[in-house]
Amino acid sequence: MSSELSETEKRKLIRERRQKKFSNGGASARLNRITGQAENSQLDTESPLDSKSSRETTPTVTKVDSNTEEMDELLENIATSPSNKVEKSQKKKEQATSPQETIDPELEIFKQLAENQQNDVSTPDLFSMLRSMKDNMAKSAATDTNPPLEPVDQQLLDYNNYLINNLKVWSIIFKWCFFLIPYLFALTRSEPISFLPEQFSNPSNFFMIFLSFEIVATSIYFQKLQNIEKSNKINGFQSNNKIVNLVSLIPEGVLPVPDIKGKVIMALQYWDVFSMFLTDICFVLVMMGLFKLI
């Protein structure tokens, strides 16, 4: 029993000596001898046993600090009134939308070019010239775009077409029945009619009389046609003509002719009048042939 106690005491003494030796800085030297590390090496071979006493434990206060900051912000939000919150949000929005974002990049380039040419007196102001060109292009683009036409009521359009056709029929009946047929009948008779003036009975004056009558009758017809369209506020050619509808599909600027739709409408109106004149000439030729046979 005494031998065992002496053996344990011996081990205890050895352990205490070793700990004392390590506490005095011998752990690092022992580690160097075990690993074969040179004395002037830059590798860190310091034993954790030597630095254990010199290290100080820092309290972990980061989590506590963050929690206290969040509590402070929460209390500040509760204390502030809603009006102050709105003002703060508006200030943040104003700061977010800086004036640099609204500046046109093209104008910035023009300004830089103008600043580079300020020293040269012979050249004009490039910035003002380019800016005026840009404004003119914007104005021309705004004027070229035709506003879309309002849809026309179909019943009103049908009524307008009915009035126009009625006017055309009555004008033809008046010209043929009350002037052309009696005049051609009197002109083709071998015996002169006493109650007619000499100018009307002379065949050489036929073309002048016929042309004058056509001009007066066509002018009256065209004036009545314009009155009907103004009263109904409908342009028959613009709303009911297939050619005008096809021309309206052509965008502005494609053809070199400006306002091609308006010119087509005017040409169709002239053709309507001229076609009535051609119809009267054909009627005169037919009636003269019939009266010659009688």
UniProtKB/Swiss-Prot annotation:
Superkingdom field: Eukaryota
Cytoplasmic side: 1-166, 226-272
Comp. bias intervals (Basic residues): 12-21
GO molecular function term, any single one: protein-membrane adaptor activity
Subcellular location field: Endoplasmic reticulum membrane; Golgi apparatus membrane
A GO cellular component annotation in the UniProt record: endoplasmic reticulum membrane
Bilayer-crossing regions: 167-187, 206-225, 273-293
Stretches for region Disordered: 1-104
Lumenal domain ranges by topology: 188-205, 294
Gene Ontology biological process terms from the UniProt entry: establishment of protein localization to endoplasmic reticulum membrane; mitophagy; retrograde vesicle-mediated transport, Golgi to endoplasmic reticulum; tail-anchored membrane protein insertion into ER membrane
Membrane-protein topology: Multi-pass membrane protein
InterPro entries on file: GET2, Get2/sif1
Stretches with biased composition (Polar residues): 34-65
Start-end of Basic and acidic residues biased regions: 85-95
Keyword annotations from UniProtKB, A to Z: Endoplasmic reticulum, ER-Golgi transport, Golgi apparatus, Membrane, Transmembrane, Transmembrane helix, Transport
Self-association state and partner proteins as the record states: Component of the Golgi to ER traffic (GET) complex, which is composed of GET1, GET2 and GET3. Within the complex, GET1 and GET2 form a heterotetramer which is stabilized by phosphatidylinositol binding and which binds to the GET3 homodimer.
Record-linked PANTHER family: GOLGI TO ER TRAFFIC PROTEIN 2
Function: Required for the post-translational delivery of tail-anchored (TA) proteins to the endoplasmic reticulum. Together with GET1, acts as a membrane receptor for soluble GET3, which recognizes and selectively binds the transmembrane domain of TA proteins in the cytosol. The GET complex cooperates with the HDEL receptor ERD2 to mediate the ATP-dependent retrieval of resident ER proteins that contain a C-terminal H-D-E-L retention signal from the Golgi to the ER.
Family: Belongs to the GET2 family.
Protein name as catalogued: Golgi to ER traffic protein 2
Lineage, highest ranks first: Eukaryota, Fungi, Dikarya, Ascomycota, Saccharomycotina
Gene that this polypeptide is encoded by: GET2
